[in-house]
């Protein structure tokens, strides 16, 4: 039987990349899925490709009022939330000496502030036993030059999960982190030259970057009842990159 049958799942940043692959995996496992994105055209295209069982809502996760409206729409259409994936995030490269206030503010607004409000505003709508999954990054453990601000934001996400896990008994949820390594998302493939991608692959013990569906598979496990006793943990889906 599909492992998410009857569950209502929310995925922020679901119009492309890992979020899109996660939405597809959840749909295939029987969940009713709601995804967010900031660009209506990309969101509409994602929903059209994913088909029935997936609903898209334009939402900026750094704006609590937009999240409130989104969660109210989910409740009206599907009821309470069983799985919440706080996946929306951005990464901006800025070498030391060239970091600006704008870089810090934009990265932390989405990756930290957005993650906090994605979870906090969802609290009244979570069903008992809900699984909350935050998207981290190997950058928090093994940062690359120029991505220190991004790495710091993802380290904050890991810390948030530890703190929130302490509230899980009283509030009836569990919270975990999935930290991908380099992943062959459309955005990465468009931005990174082929020779740089090859160098990145050589630094991974498995010798390749991840496919988005491989990250989605880990998230699906954490969303399912098979992980019912997993709480406050970080799952690295990185081919061993940050482990050796």
Show where each model-derived region lies.
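Alpha-helical segment proximal to the catalytic Tyr-Lys
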Residues: 124, 166-167, 228
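Substrate-binding pocket helix/loop in short-chain dehydrogenase/reductase
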Residues: 95-96, 100-108, 200
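Short, small/polar-rich loop/turn modules that mediate ligand/substrate recognition or access, typified
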Residues: 169, 174, 230-232
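Conserved glycine-rich cofactor-binding loop
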Residues: 8, 15-17
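Active-site helix of classical SDR
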Residues: 119, 153, 161
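Residue(s) in the substrate-gating loop at a strand-loop-helix junction
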Residues: 137
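Short C-terminal tail/terminal secondary-structure segment
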Residues: 142, 220, 231-244
């Amino acid at each position: 039987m599909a492992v998410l049958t009857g569950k209502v799942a929310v995925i922020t940043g679901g119009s492309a990349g890992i979020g899109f692959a996660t939405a597809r995996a959840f749909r295939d496992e029987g969940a009713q899925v709601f995804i967010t994105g900031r660009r209506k055209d990309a969101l509409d295209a994602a929903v059209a490709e994913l088909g029935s069982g997936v609903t898209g809502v334009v939402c900026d996760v750094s704006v609590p009022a937009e999240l409130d409206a989104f969660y109210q729409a989910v409740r009206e259409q599907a009821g309470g939330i069983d799985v919440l994936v706080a996946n929306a995030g951005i990464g901006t490269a800025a070498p030391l000496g060239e970091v600006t206030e704008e870089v810090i503010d934009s990265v932390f607004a989405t990756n930290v502030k957005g993650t906090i409000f994605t979870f906090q505003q969802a609290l009244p709508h979570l069903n008992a036993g809900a699984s909350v999954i935050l998207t981290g990054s190997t950058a928090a453990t093994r940062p690359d030059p120029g991505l220190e601000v991004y790495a710091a934001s993802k380290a904050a996400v890991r810390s948030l999960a530890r703190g929130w896990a302490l509230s899980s008994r009283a509030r009836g949820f569990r919270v975990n982190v999935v930290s991908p390594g380099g992943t062959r998302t459309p955005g990465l493939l468009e931005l990174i030259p082929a020779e740089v991608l090859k160098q990145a692959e050589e630094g991974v013990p498995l010798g390749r970057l991840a496919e988005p569906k491989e990250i989605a598979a880990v998230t699906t496990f954490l969303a399912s009842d098979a992980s019912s006793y997993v709480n406050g943990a970080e799952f690295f889906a990185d081919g061993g990159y940050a482990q050796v």
